[in-house]
Amino acid sequence: MHIPAIAAVSLFALAAASSAQAQPAAKALQVKIGTASPLSGTGAHQGKDIENGARMAIDDLNAKGIVLGGRKLQWVLQPEDDAADPKTGAAVAQKLVDAKVAAVVGHLNSGTTVPASKIYANAGIPQISPAATTPLYTNQGFKTAFRVVANDNLVGRTLATYAIGTLKAKKIAVIDDRTAFGQGLADEFAKGVKKAGSGAAVVSRQFTNDKATDFNAILTQIRARDPDVIFYGGMDAVAGPMLKQMKALGLRAKLVSGDGVCSEKMPLLAGDALGDDKVYCVVAGGVGPAQEAGLNAFNARYQQRYKMPVQTYAPYAYDAVMVFAKAMQAANSSDPAKYLPALAAVKHEGVTGSIAFDPKGDLRNAALTLYTFRKGQKVKLQVLR
């Protein structure tokens, strides 16, 4: 039977359309991001903060409908509990490697971050820590190790300068919890005091541990030296009870510390011993007026979603996920081997500030934000550079 040309063309077009409709849409490409942080123990509130921040980023990325290599991406979060323990951290790292994650946001504690970083490096999986500050982490020479916070060198030096220059401290006591984070930070602070050469000096150096609850022995020794400032290298779970015992012993010294103490939980942990302008602490990152609105909006979204305020690290975890996504888009691939060069060269304006990495994986031009506590609230004082 003869079919007119126009009819034949129409039938062909209809058949082609039917065939196209019959073809299933390309399956979404799953990109799995792991988080590793303490979800149990005394640091669980900080570790959950990291997971929550990363999850917000994952949801935002899925809402964008990002396409790589012609396939829509499905972003998936795999959170793991490292219990702030080096051995558990190493086991978690291997679990994430075996799960074939494309990237890892973690760990929180320096003591878990360093051993885990070797496992990620051997597997070629990029890692961005939203919290670990020990210089050792990025001094190992691993091309997969990055962080979006300042390291102890900057934090310790900056806090020493502030304690001497602004708080006018002459006699300073130093305590650390013997963890990689706490000891490293305290050592750098002590070096900063010595380097200042302004007549200020460390008059007492004491040690505790990250699970301690009784500090009377070391605080009694410190009280005998009548310091102006006590520097503590460690986390809020220890700093809170320590402040209570400082008050009970009549210690008038101000407490200075790093980001581990700069949490929203400190008022609960320290009670009325927190006082006003008694505690000074810094967190990594520093946003100017132009970026302040973005950070405030993130904090408000977090509060609305989780019915609690940001502790410390959620914005850094959020930025870490977004930095990974930006590098993958630049490389048009979620394969770690392909996007790693783009990650090393990334430039990103995040909620915590400008992010770019130096050859070691540290932040370029890192800034710190100084806080104190007044009437049970954390109050921003200034950005330090």
What are these regions (language model features)?
Residues P24-A25, Q30, H45-N52, V67-F142, ...:
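Beta-alpha junction/loop-to-helix N-cap segments that form part of ligand/metal-binding clefts
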Residues G34-R55, E80-P86, L108-G111, I175-Q183, ...:
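Extracytoplasmic "Venus flytrap"
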Residues A91, T134-L136, K143-G250, V287-A297:
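Extracellular/periplasmic Venus flytrap/periplasmic-binding protein
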Residues L96-L108, I128-P130, K171-D176, D226-M235, ...:
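Periplasmic-binding protein-like
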Residues R301-A314, V323-K380:
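Segments of small-molecule ligand-sensing domains
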